[in-house]
């Protein structure tokens, strides 16, 4: 069996793959002399094909990397840019080499992953500073990776981003977080009070809401974590928890008096015996969140 790191384990692979991952330059020269296209993906398994440079970078085979680049391998492939592979699998020597030969440090792959995210996926935390120093700065590009890193609870990594000026309130939508949460909202959704306090201590804003109006406090209420909810309540403006202010906020919705009374009561749920849903539970009046459905 041949293990190509996280690309998979294979019973057998084409000889050219062995030549690439073992740095057999004479074998590569022989293939080139017979018309081999060094940018054409190689079928490694039934559902797995990878370019020669990708294989060399994944396996960190420097002789093959250098030979392929010298013979015209594409460094800025749209699906798998060499810089992302280098920071995910390689070391400083490999990273510097591909950059010196034209690799784009701002490249994104086919699923819009950038260099910081790639390094985190590969757990190559030592490459984060290298990426920043090469001009793909934390201040401009680090927000997405920082938010994704919240759930890993690696405080050393989070310290790196914060110390280098990351936007701690980054909340742009993406495929993972289309509802525009801040890192603090993500931590609240994972019911991680320690992380929430850490983020607040470093300047996270407790009042920024998600796309549907949920903020850290209301997320804590929804999750049923009253300790976290009380923590956020002490940090929020007093008017957020004032009944008259809430009624003014809800006035445009023209709520029936019966509904207002229900939301002020102690029983905030009702059962649905003939439905796929067991019951519906509501937030208290002061914690309701106005939002628009659809457009």
Where are these regions (language model features)?
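Ankyrin repeat domain, specifically the short helix-to-loop turn at the C-terminus of the second helix
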Residues: 29-38, 66-74, 96-104, 129-137, ...
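A generic tandem-repeat structural signature
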Residues: 56-124
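Ankyrin-repeat boundary/"N-cap" motif
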Residues: 8-18, 41-55, 76-85, 108-116, ...
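Solenoidal tandem-repeat scaffolds enriched in leucines and small polar residues
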Residues: 103-166, 174
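A surface-exposed partner-binding patch
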Residues: 212-295
């Amino acid at each position: 069996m041949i293990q190509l790191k996280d690309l998979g384990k294979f019973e057998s692979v084409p000889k050219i793959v062995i030549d690439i991952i073992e740095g057999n330059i004479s074998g590569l020269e022989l293939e080139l002399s017979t018309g081999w296209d060094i940018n054409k993906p190689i079928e490694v398994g039934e559902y797995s094909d990878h370019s020669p440079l990708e294989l060399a970078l994944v396996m960190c085979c420097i002789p093959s990397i250098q030979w392929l680049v010298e013979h015209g391998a594409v460094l800025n492939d749209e699906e798998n840019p060499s810089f992302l592979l280098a920071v995910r699998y390689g070391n400083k020597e490999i990273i510097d080499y591909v950059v010196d030969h034209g690799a784009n440090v701002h490249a994104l792959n086919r699923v819009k992953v950038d260099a910081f995210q790639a390094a985190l996926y590969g757990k190559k935390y030592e490459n984060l500073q290298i990426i920043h120093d090469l001009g793909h700065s934390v201040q401009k590009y680090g927000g997405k990776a920082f938010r994704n890193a919240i759930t890993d609870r690696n405080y050393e990594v989070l310290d790196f981003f914060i110390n280098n000026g990351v936007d701690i309130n980054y909340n742009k939508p993406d495929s993972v977080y289309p509802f525009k949460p801040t890192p603090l909202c993500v931590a609240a959704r994972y019911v991680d009070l320690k992380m929430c306090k850490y983020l607040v201590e470093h300047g996270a804003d407790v009042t920024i809401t998600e796309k549907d109006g949920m903020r850290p406090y209301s997320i804590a209420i929804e999750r049923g974590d009253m300790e976290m909810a009380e923590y956020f309540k002490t940090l929020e403006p007093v008017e957020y928890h004032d009944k008259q202010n809430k009624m003014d906020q809800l006035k445009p919705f023209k709520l029936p008096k019966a509904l207002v009374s229900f939301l002020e009561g102690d029983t905030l749920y009702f059962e649905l015996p003939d439905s796929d849903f067991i019951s519906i539970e509501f937030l208290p009046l002061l914690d309701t969140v106005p939002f628009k459905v659809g457009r």
